[in-house]
């Protein structure tokens, strides 16, 4: 067995945190539980998951496993050089004592009957551009592990109760003796009868089959504050999955996703808008109604405005989540060049070019009246 097999059984990496290992164990344990999964080989997989978790959940045993593999985790010392204890500091036996104590249960065991909080959940909610700016209230619906309504989470058939496990006497662990080159060593492992709960269910609940949990659709109202952005999270305490041994529910993390706007763009509390104007408006100036999320605002365009010029509408942006106040809206001018001109428009532009002293590459085409003058030879 290599030094990553236990991690592979739980589907986590070798540098996984204890919290990640615990969540993976719960997930895999439910997946292969014999009372839920009737497929061939599920029970064996379940035992392998228990074995992996029993080692990786204990800091000292995990350290021994990472360094020496299964032999270290199970009490063997293969890998030591015959001439001494290579790898340990010659000034003391601190590292050896840590590993040695894990074989004898020196590190202690957690109370298997202690209440444990349920798993956290995530839910992604879509908001319109305006909802993200002004805030909203959304009702979200999702499936979660809830306390079984039939047995109230005990896992036992109504009218019955779990009893103290006869094998481990309620401790959740049993002692196992292992023969090693150093003699018989005793270590503690999770009880294979009660799976570490310390209690044995003789008559299982017909609804949850002894797990104490059942899948239910849950609805909750979420208040979205004004000014949120994509990727931000809102934590709803107690809206996650049911706990264990009477422990509290986990939390729900609502992840915000803001849908794009057809008119505006946004960065933090600043909103951006592109204003298309004509050459005439840019040259002569104009007063234009500018759309904002707060309603139309009248803005003056000075004569001679160039493409790319940006104006600021103060207080017309999004709320600032931190520090309070309101952001601004930036209006950037884009001068639109017409693609289709009628004869009158062309005449006017040619006249403008002549008045400006611009030299045209292509000479002005004669109009109808010019042609009449030429025909009559009129000056």
Curated annotation (Swiss-Prot):
Cysteine disulfide partners in this protein: none
Designated name of the protein: Chaperone protein DnaJ
Cofactor(s) named in the record: Zn(2+)
Domain-related comment: The J domain is necessary and sufficient to stimulate DnaK ATPase activity. Zinc center 1 plays an important role in the autonomous, DnaK-independent chaperone activity of DnaJ. Zinc center 2 is essential for interaction with DnaK and for DnaJ activity.
Keyword check for Transit peptide: no
SUPFAM superfamilies: Chaperone J-domain (SSF46565), DnaJ/Hsp40 cysteine-rich domain (SSF57938), HSP40/DnaJ peptide-binding domain (SSF49493)
InterPro entries attached to this UniProt entry: DnaJ, DnaJ_C, DnaJ_domain, DnaJ_domain_CS, HSP40/DnaJ_pept-bd, HSP_DnaJ_Cys-rich_dom, HSP_DnaJ_Cys-rich_dom_sf, J_dom_sf
Family, as annotated: Belongs to the DnaJ family.
GO biological process: chaperone cofactor-dependent protein refolding; DNA replication; protein refolding; response to heat
PROSITE patterns found in the cross-reference section: DNAJ_1, DNAJ_2, ZF_CR
CXXCXGXG motif repeats: from-to residues: 148-155, 165-172, 191-198, 205-212
Binding site for Zn(2+) 1: 148, 151, 205, 208
Protein's organism: Streptococcus agalactiae serotype V (strain ATCC BAA-611 / 2603 V/R)
Gene3D superfamilies: DnaJ domain, Heat shock protein DnaJ, cysteine-rich domain, Urease metallochaperone UreE, N-terminal domain
GO cellular component terms given for this protein: cytoplasm
């Amino acid at each position: 067995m290599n030094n990553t097999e236990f991690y592979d059984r739980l589907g986590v990496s070798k540098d996984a945190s204890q919290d990640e290992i615990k969540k993976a164990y719960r997930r895999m344990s439910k997946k292969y539980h014999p009372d839920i999964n009737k497929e061939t080989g599920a029970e064996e997989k379940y035992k392998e998951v228990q074995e992996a978790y029993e080692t990786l959940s204990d800091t000292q045993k995990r350290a021994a496993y990472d360094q020496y593999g299964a032999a270290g985790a199970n009490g063997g010392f293969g890998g030591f050089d015959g001439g001494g204890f290579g790898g340990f500091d010659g000034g003391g036996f601190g590292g050896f004592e840590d590993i040695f104590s894990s074989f004898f249960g020196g590190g202690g065991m957690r109370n298997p009957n202690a209440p444990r909080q349920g798993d956290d959940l995530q839910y992604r909610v879509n908001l319109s551009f305006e909802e993200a700016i002004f805030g909203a209230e959304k009702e979200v619906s999702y499936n979660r592990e809830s306390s079984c309504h039939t047995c109230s989470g005990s896992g036992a058939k109504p009218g019955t109760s779990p009893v103290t496990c006869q094998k481990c006497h309620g401790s959740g662990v049993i002692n196992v003796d292992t023969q090693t080159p150093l003699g018989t060593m005793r270590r503690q492992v999770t009880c294979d009868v009660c799976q570490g709960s310390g209690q044995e269910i003789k008559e299982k609940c017909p609804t949850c089959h002894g797990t104490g949990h059942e899948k239910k659709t849950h609805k909750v109202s979420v208040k979205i504050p004004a000014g949120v952005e994509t990727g931000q999270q809102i934590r709803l305490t107690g809206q996650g999955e049911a706990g264990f041994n009477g422990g509290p529910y986990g939390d729900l993390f609502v992840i915000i996703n803001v849908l794009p706007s057809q008119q505006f763009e946004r960065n933090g509390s600043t909103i951006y808008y592109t204003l298309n104007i004509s050459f005439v408006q840019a040259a002569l100036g104009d007063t234009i109604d500018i759309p904002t999320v707060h309603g139309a605002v009248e803005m003056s365009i000075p004569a001679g405005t160039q493409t790319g010029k940006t104006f600021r509408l103060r207080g017309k942006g999004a709320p600032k989540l931190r520090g309070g106040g309101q952001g601004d809206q930036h209006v950037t001018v884009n001068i639109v060049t017409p693609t289709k001109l009628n004869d009158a428009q062309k005449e006017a532009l040619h006249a403008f070019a002549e008045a400006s002293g611009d030299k045209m590459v292509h000479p002005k085409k004669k109009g109808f009246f010019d042609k009449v003058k030429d025909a009559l030879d009129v000056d």
